[in-house]
UniProtKB/Swiss-Prot annotation:
An example Gene Ontology biological process: DNA-templated transcription initiation
Function as written in the Swiss-Prot or TrEMBL entry: DNA-dependent RNA polymerase (RNAP) catalyzes the transcription of DNA into RNA using the four ribonucleoside triphosphates as substrates. The highly mobile Rpo4/Rpo7 heterodimer is conditionally required for transcription initiation.
Species assigned in the record: Saccharolobus shibatae (strain ATCC 51178 / DSM 5389 / JCM 8931 / NBRC 15437 / B12)
Cross-referenced CDD domains: RNAP_E_N, S1_RpoE
Subunit structure: Part of the 13-subunit RNA polymerase complex. Forms a stalk with Rpo4 that extends from the main structure.
SUPFAM superfamilies xref list: N-terminal, heterodimerisation domain of RBP7 (RpoE), Nucleic acid-binding proteins
Sequence similarity: Belongs to the eukaryotic RPB7/RPC8 RNA polymerase subunit family.
Annotated catalysed reactions: RNA(n) + a ribonucleoside 5'-triphosphate = RNA(n+1) + diphosphate
Enzymatic class: transferase
Stated name of the protein: DNA-directed RNA polymerase subunit Rpo7
GO cellular component: cytoplasm; DNA-directed RNA polymerase complex
Enzyme Commission identifier(s): 2.7.7.6
Gene3D superfamilies attached to this UniProt entry: Nucleic acid-binding proteins (2.40.50.140), RNA polymerase Rpb7-like, N-terminal domain (3.30.1490.120)
Keywords assigned: Cytoplasm, DNA-directed RNA polymerase, Nucleotidyltransferase, Transcription, Transferase
Amino acid sequence: MYKLIKARSIVRIPPNEFGKPLNEIALNELRQQYQEKILKDLGLVLAILNVKTSEEGMLVFGDGATYHEVEFDMITYVPVVQEVVEGEVLQVDNYGVFVNLGPMDGLVHISQITDDTLKYDNVRGIIFGEKSKKVIQKGDKVRARVISVASTVTGRLPRIALTMRQPYLGKLEWITQAKK
């Protein structure tokens, strides 16, 4: 789930940046501090927007920089259990498929792809159904549901487990065929 979060912080403006527009400097400092990092309870920070920097700064003894209060928006992504997502198959292995969800990747275990008995063909890099003859391969567009999000070491992306074994989930091509 994508979130738009309003935040406040204090930004250090180094002396070599004096004379430049405050909002630009603050934006660069905030990007270095937050962007592409995972923040507890907020998720993966994708972008920093709408920076408003206070004109008045504070000085700290022994530091030539000024410190300014800033307000800004962050766009974050947090995978939520039961969320339905669409993505592209990045990799096919004997144990399942990896799906790009945008900011993160998820794994659909081979047992969670369809109700059919599935086989992996390592020569062609595909998984196919024995009875249905359904094929899934790299580049396919799929719809899946998040069934678990396992936190890993702080600062690392979580492991996302997906399923496609429910109605209206699976390869998009299979879904449109089932509707007919």
